[in-house]
Each structure stands twice: as structure tokens, then as C-alpha cells.
Amino acid sequence: MAEHNELGKKGEELAVEYLRLKEYEILELNYRYQKAEVDIIAKRGNTLIAAEVKTRSTPEFGNPQDFVKPKQIQQLVKAVNHYVEEGELDVEVRFDIIAIIKNKAGTKIEHIQDAFFYF
């Protein structure tokens, strides 16, 4: 596996651990619908959280959250709408980004709630 893929996988594992510590219930990992993949679908109270995990080894070329592009947001929204409709869920939906910088110096996790809105 390529080094960046390993870093991404480790980032997703760290994000799941982080959310569990914050008392989120993890419902799905790597949920796929059409061309979209939602890294983590979790629930806390009556809120469904779709979390996109972005992991980098350095912020040198930009913060991890800066790498979520509009097209990806459109696909995430479509996938989560499908998930909610398919499950006939009556929940509030929130889109979060979990930005992780992980390197030899340590790990920094930033949880950005309501990172973007959908219409």
C-alpha cells in the first residue's frame, strides 16, 4: 500500500477513535453510493453526522480541510441523502470535517462541525 494510503487509513482510524471518545455512535465506515464515499457516518442524539476525514503529514501545502472540493461536497450530500431516505431516518444531518496532521512530531486533530451546508 502506498504511504499516502496508509496515512489516510490511519487518519480514519484516529477519527473513529476520537468520535467514540466524544460519545458518537459509529454507524458506517466508508459508505459508498454511486461515485461518492462517506468516510464516517455517525450519530449523536438525533443528529446524523457525515464526516469527511482529511489527513496530511504536514500543513505546508495547506490545511487538510482545504482539500475538500465543491464536487466532492456535492457527491457527499447525494450519498447522505440516499442513506437517510433508504433508512427512512428522521434526523438532523450535519456535515463535519475531521482534519488530521500526523507526523513524527505528533498528531493534531481538528473537528470542524457544520463544515459545509447543503441545499
Curated annotation (Swiss-Prot):
Name of a matching Pfam family: UPF0102
Any one Gene Ontology molecular-function term assigned to this protein's record: nucleic acid binding
SUPFAM superfamilies on file: Restriction endonuclease-like
InterPro entries: Restrct_endonuc-II-like, tRNA_endonuc-like_dom_sf, UPF0102_YraN-like
Cysteine disulfide links: none
Listed NCBIfam families: PRK12497.1-3
Family: Belongs to the UPF0102 family.
Protein name per its UniProtKB record: UPF0102 protein GFO_3098
Organism: Christiangramia forsetii (strain DSM 17595 / CGMCC 1.15422 / KT0803)
